[in-house]
């Protein structure tokens, strides 16, 4: 990790130092995704079977996972892991249940009633990546709020062969339909529907560059997605009271995600920075994914700040996905932290807790999007509608205001919609 003293940098250098690794969708990826889209839209299930053989090296008998397959998968999972998943599910349920919208129903003036009503998104699709490490925790993060929100149909896609942990967790969360479909083809299948796959209104879940590009394309064509996606990242604010081993472990927990991940340490203590660098090397030696972590560390940085106030300013400028605060009285900094997907306060709140079981959602905006986007929550699985209802007297009292405004905007039909009613009321 490169170490930089913040106050020695000019504005351009600061901006460059806070930059992320470049994210560019290559022409090859775009062309490949376009070909997959055309194939799925034109050939439906047939394309999905062919693509499973091509990309997943799997010959499928059915795209739909049977209840018997789910039951067999559940039996193969250790009891201890089942209990851990159930504990995490309970915490996630409690946190998201508490996010239910409060009723908004009031008179803005006498006889003018305004409301906000919330309705679930009817049909949602969840995408869970495959690979060597099954992300069954993401099933919890997506399926639990979808159920609490009351989504009518929840389907899940994951590349075959689907890990037992994913099948067990999906079933535990009440997902009734699971498809053995991965990659960009899963996104296009859920967005457009096929003979077997139900069309959905919104798609959730992470994925590789092909999945990300497919989600971008379906968003342009009318299917909603959860949020823009990018490489994983963490920023740690630490002072002289922080444990360098703890700080190093938090940085490495993100660095091991992928070579394009980025980790940032911001501290007002040079000694802590040096101790953390030593601890990183010691811990790297014990990590199975050390090579991946080293690649991420190559474009990661340590910033030496003047004081904690400057640490906060740097963090807000970077706008991290994960923000770990390991300082004395960490909660005292919270009112000044404006841009982060999820914040972890104190020495015993590692980012891993939020990734799995504290109850917060680990689906977070990255790449600086936390300036304008929020962590995934119950609201993402529902939509708000406003309602207004006016009594005759309420209408009369507000009529002149509306007619004056409509006339000023030269929208005569708007004005007449009020004037016609007002005339009939005065005749009664």
UniProtKB/Swiss-Prot annotation:
Zn(2+) binds at residues 254, 257, 355, 414. GO terms for molecular function: histidinol dehydrogenase activity; NAD binding; zinc ion binding. Signal peptide: none annotated. GO terms for cellular component: cytosol. Pathway: Amino-acid biosynthesis; L-histidine biosynthesis; L-histidine from 5-phospho-alpha-D-ribose 1-diphosphate: step 9/9. One of its GO terms (biological process) is L-histidine biosynthetic process. Substrate binds at residues 232, 254, 257, 322, 355, 409, 414. It catalyses: L-histidinol + 2 NAD(+) + H2O = L-histidine + 2 NADH + 3 H(+). It holds the Pfam family Histidinol_dh. Keywords: Amino-acid biosynthesis, Histidine biosynthesis, Metal-binding, NAD, Oxidoreductase, Zinc. Its cofactor is Zn(2+). NAD(+) binds at residues 127, 185, 208. Its EC number is 1.1.1.23. The active site is at 321 (proton acceptor), 322 (proton acceptor). It is an enzyme of class 1 (oxidoreductase). Belongs to the histidinol dehydrogenase family. Catalyzes the sequential NAD-dependent oxidations of L-histidinol to L-histidinaldehyde and then to L-histidine. This is Histidinol dehydrogenase. The gene is hisD.
């Amino acid at each position: 990790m490169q170490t930089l003293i913040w106050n020695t940098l000019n504005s351009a250098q600061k901006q460059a130092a806070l930059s992320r690794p470049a994210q560019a969708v290559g022409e090859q990826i775009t062309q490949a995704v376009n070909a997959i889209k055309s194939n799925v839209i034109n050939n439906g299930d047939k394309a999905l079977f062919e693509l499973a053989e091509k990309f997943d090296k799997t010959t499928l008998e059915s795209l739909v996972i049977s209840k018997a397959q789910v039951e067999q998968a559940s039996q193969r999972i250790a009891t201890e892991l089942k209990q851990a998943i159930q504990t995490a599910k309970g915490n996630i349920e409690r946190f998201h249940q508490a996010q239910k919208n409060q009723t908004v129903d009031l008179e803005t003036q006498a006889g003018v009633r305004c409301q906000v009503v919330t309705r679930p998104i009817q049909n949602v699709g969840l995408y869970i990546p495959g690979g060597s490490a099954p992300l069954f925790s993401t099933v919890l993060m997506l399926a639990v709020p979808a159920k609490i929100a009351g989504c009518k149909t929840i389907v899940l896609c994951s590349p075959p062969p689907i890990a037992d942990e994913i099948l067990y967790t999906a079933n535990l969360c009440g997902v009734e339909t699971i498809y053995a479909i991965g990659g960009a083809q899963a996104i296009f299948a859920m967005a457009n529907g096929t003979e077997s796959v139900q069309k959905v209104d919104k798609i959730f879940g992470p994925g590789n560059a092909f999945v990300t590009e497919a989600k971008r394309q379906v968003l342009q064509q009318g299917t909603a997605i959860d949020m823009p996606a990018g490489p994983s990242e963490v920023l740690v604010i630490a002072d002289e009271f922080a444990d360098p081993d703890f700080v190093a472990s938090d940085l490495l927990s993100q660095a091991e995600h992928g070579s394009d991940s980025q980790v940032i340490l911001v501290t007002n203590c040079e000694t802590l920075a040096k101790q953390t660098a030593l601890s990183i090397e010691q811990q790297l030696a014990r990590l199975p994914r050390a090579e991946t972590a080293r690649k991420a560390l190559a474009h990661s940085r340590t910033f030496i700040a003047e004081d904690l106030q400057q640490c906060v300013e740097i963090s807000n400028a970077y706008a991290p996905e994960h923000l770990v605060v390991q300082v004395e009285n960490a909660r005292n900094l919270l009112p000044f932290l404006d841009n982060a997907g999820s914040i972890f306060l104190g020495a015993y709140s590692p980012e891993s807790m939020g990734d799995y079981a504290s109850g917060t959602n680990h689906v977070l905006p990255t790449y600086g999007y936390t300036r304008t986007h929020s962590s995934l929550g119950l609201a993402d699985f529902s939509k708000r509608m406003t309602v207004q209802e006016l009594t005759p007297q309420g209408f009369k009292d507000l009529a002149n205001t509306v007619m004056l405004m409509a006339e000023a905007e030269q929208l005569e039909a708007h004005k007449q919609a009020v004037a016609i009613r007002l005339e009939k009321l005065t005749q009664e």
